[in-house]
């Protein structure tokens, strides 16, 4: 039976959207699912402050009445203005290993992006650059971390089949923290601080950090 694409328009459908990721990876020892309620809030246009600068649409793919894929289309207007671009993002994307399903999902989000006046689609991304980004292409036998998105090996293969190309590589490293900072590193740290007039700031509470928040985010964006 053919694939049917439906836009998510109710809370019930949104929960299906969230739970599909959990169902698809059920039994996978390396996948760490998100918390359902937390994901619901993230995708809720009335609760996530990102929607002050973002637009979004969610799609579910059905076959024989069963959910077989999901995808979100997003536009971060502020990011587009900052970088003078017309980019739509795709994210929260999951699907069974089926070309018909994948094509239908991306056809839907590509059509939406064009209708919004966008000329490019990139992802997987979140609403902002502080959200999870990227698609796993190696390390499928490693437990996913809080900074990454875990996916099956067939995901990048399906993306390449459709003609999508890789933008850049991100590498993740495991670092073992010693009991104490090596003396050599302490000496180098002191030299660098004196040379550039640097100082380490210690904050007692969240309120004391706020005056520096904009500078921190500006540095991250740069």
For the regions a protein language model found, what residue spans apply to each?
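Short amphipathic alpha-helix that is part of the acyltransferase structural core
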Residues: 1-46, 196-222
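A short helix-loop-beta-strand connector motif used in the catalytic cores of GNAT acetyltransferases and
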Residues: 44-60
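Acyl-donor binding region in acyl/amide transferases
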Residues: 81-168
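Acyltransferase donor/substrate-recognition loop-hinge adjacent to the catalytic core
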Residues: 149-222
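Conserved beta-hairpin
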Residues: 56-71, 160, 166-169
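Flexible loop/turn segments at secondary-structure boundaries
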Residues: 14, 67, 77-80, 129-131, ...
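Membrane-embedded alpha-helical bundles of multi-pass transporters/translocases
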Residues: 20-21, 25, 52-56, 70
